[in-house]
């Protein structure tokens, strides 16, 4: 296969979430041509919000982003008053007693709201919105790939990268069917909500590292602090359907919690939108990369439950490795097939290991008899190594019809 140079190499990125945008920023910084497509109609049009941790991948992110983008990282932090290299211990607290169970150490890092991180990474990136991928075609010459969208438009490139999240359409093409690419359900009822108490004393009483989402008016105005709250429990049937029904159930369950958690949930304003998050995963496995012309990155490659703070870190790690592989292709030191196959050889087992670990950790964190043996207690925030035991392949598969119904 002919090796493209920097002038004719063209990377097609499907998905303008955080991972796709970081990849676009890194390609732009490297002088490699790209186009990025997003099926949503605009940036951050969804009302749902959540926060994510960046820790062991922070140095990789610094290398990937242009200096002027990384310089603003502290400004998008959930708590901009805390330096990136401050470090500390992430508290794990027994909800019913209020006692500290453990402190998970981290040397550097931060938490970021999804919307702010996405906005930071979108600056200077020309995202083509409203582009819903329906087909991927490969030229007979084996020199390119074509993305086909539902509005009738097409885009040609050297390689197509699926950065389109847990329910990736690109993964369906890579695996050859929607069934093989389908995520599995994690059987938990997981709620999350964005809360402003509009009361300084209430906000101060629940000032915790893991719950602050943003401080719009700074640390001296707690009445404006925005909190990201979540409550989850195993529940298969009788799930509340409306925001208010979910809030009523949360308030009821909160009565068994110790302070300040009990009041923090009881005080949630009546008009709060309590979202239900469909927690799912896909155990990473090899796919057909079509001579290096099709691959996956981030949540499209290894969607996992959010119970060890690893997801975004692996997305950033993927981007670092993938950029290095594309650079080799552009430099002429590796063919596209060689470079992408090497990228996948590192990423696939790493992703598979972490997905299995996060599933295991999710079960163990909801079982008092096992919680102290869970990966987050044994390993902390460090990336796993060699954790690939047990099987989660037998869980119920979430098919496209199920996804559409939620």
Locate predicted features.
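C-terminal helical "tail/cap" subdomain of flavin- and related membrane-associated enzymes
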Residues: 2-9, 29, 70-74, 78-85, ...
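Short, solvent-exposed loop/turn segments at secondary-structure boundaries
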Residues: 46-50, 241, 307-310
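Short aromatic-enriched loop/helix-cap "lid" or pocket-rim segments at secondary-structure transitions
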Residues: 47-50, 173, 202-205, 355-356, ...
């Amino acid at each position: 296969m002919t090796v493209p140079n920097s002038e004719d190499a063209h990377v097609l990125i499907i998905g303008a979430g955080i991972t796709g945008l970081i990849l676009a920023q890194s390609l732009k910084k490297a002088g490699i041509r790209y186009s990025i497509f997003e099926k949503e109609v605009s940036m951050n049009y969804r009302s749902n919000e959540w926060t994510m941790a960046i820790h062991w991948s922070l140095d990789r992110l610094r290398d990937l982003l242009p200096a002027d983008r990384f310089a603003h990282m502290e400004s998008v932090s959930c708590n901009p008053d805390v330096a990136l290299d401050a470090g500390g211990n992430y508290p794990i607290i027994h909800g019913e007693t209020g006692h500290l169970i453990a402190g998970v150490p981290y040397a550097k890092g931060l938490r970021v709201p999804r919307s702010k991180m996405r906005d930071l990474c979108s600056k200077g990136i020309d995202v083509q919105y409203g582009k819903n991928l329906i087909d991927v075609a490969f030229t007979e010459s084996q020199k390119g790939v074509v993305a086909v969208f539902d509005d009738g438009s097409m885009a040609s490139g050297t390689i197509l990268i699926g950065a389109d999240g847990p329910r990736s359409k690109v993964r369906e093409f890579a695996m050859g069917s929607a069934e093989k690419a389908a995520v599995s359900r994690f059987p938990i009822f997981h709620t999350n909500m964005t809360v402003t108490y509009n009361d300084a004393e209430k906000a101060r009483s629940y000032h915790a590292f893991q719950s602050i989402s943003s401080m719009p008016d700074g640390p001296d105005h707690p009445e404006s602090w925005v909190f990201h709250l979540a409550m989850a429990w195993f529940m298969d049937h009788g799930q509340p359907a409306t925001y208010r029904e979910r809030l009523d159930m949360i308030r009821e369950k909160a009565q068994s919690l110790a302070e300040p958690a009990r009041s923090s949930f009881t005080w949630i304003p009546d008009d709060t939108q309590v979202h239900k998050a469909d927690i799912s995963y896909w155990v990473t496995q090899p796919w057909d990369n079509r001579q290096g012309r099709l691959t996956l990155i981030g949540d499209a490659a290894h969607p996992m439950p959010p119970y060890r703070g690893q997801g975004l870190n692996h997305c950033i790690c993927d981007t670092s490795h993938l950029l290095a592989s594309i650079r080799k292709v552009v430099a002429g030191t590796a063919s596209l097939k060689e470079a992408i196959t090497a990228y996948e050889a590192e990423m696939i087992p790493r992703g598979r290991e972490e997905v299995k670990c996060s599933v295991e950790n999710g079960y163990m964190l909801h079982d008092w008899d096992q919680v102290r043996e869970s990966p987050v207690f044994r390993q902390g925030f460090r990336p796993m190594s060699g954790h690939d035991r047990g099987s989660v392949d037998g869980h119920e598969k979430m098919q496209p019809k199920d996804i559409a119904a939620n």
